[in-house]
Amino acid sequence: MFCKVNYHSVTVKALETSQLLSLHTHTLELLLSENPQLLVEYLKWLQIENMKHQSRLRDLVLNGKKGALFSTLIRLANTYGEFRSDNEVLIKFPLTNTEIANLCATSREMINRMLNDLKKHHIISFDKSYNTIHDFQFLKDEIACENCPLNICRID
């Protein structure tokens, strides 16, 4: 926007029936330049999105593969989780190990090993339609979680 870059590095997959609204770039640029309040809200949204990406990149780069998995599980819990107790979270969003590996920028085999290790230590458990984190604080402690606001520490 406001420049001539035609490359977009994101894809979207609808999880339920959705309607798509499309605006030409020029139309949005015109709306933003004519409406300062809309521009401010847009900039706030952009800043939050930037903070989400920065924190995810930080976790992937600084915490290694295990930290990437732990931070991804924390983000999944914050986005789709139902907190059952102070330390247990039910994630009602089915993901394959391949999908989790893609979120962590690592291989499925590596994720399988780490998830099985967490399962062996009763940190998490799996079911076909959901995953349960039994020791949420353990994951946070392992990556020295900074307790980012929930609108930042999310998958979406």
Model-flagged regions — what are they?
Residues 17-19, 130:
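Structural motif
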Residues 32-36, 143-146:
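A short, polar/proline- and glycine-enriched secondary-structure boundary/capping micro-motif
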Residues 78-156:
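Phosphate-/nucleic-acid-contacting segments
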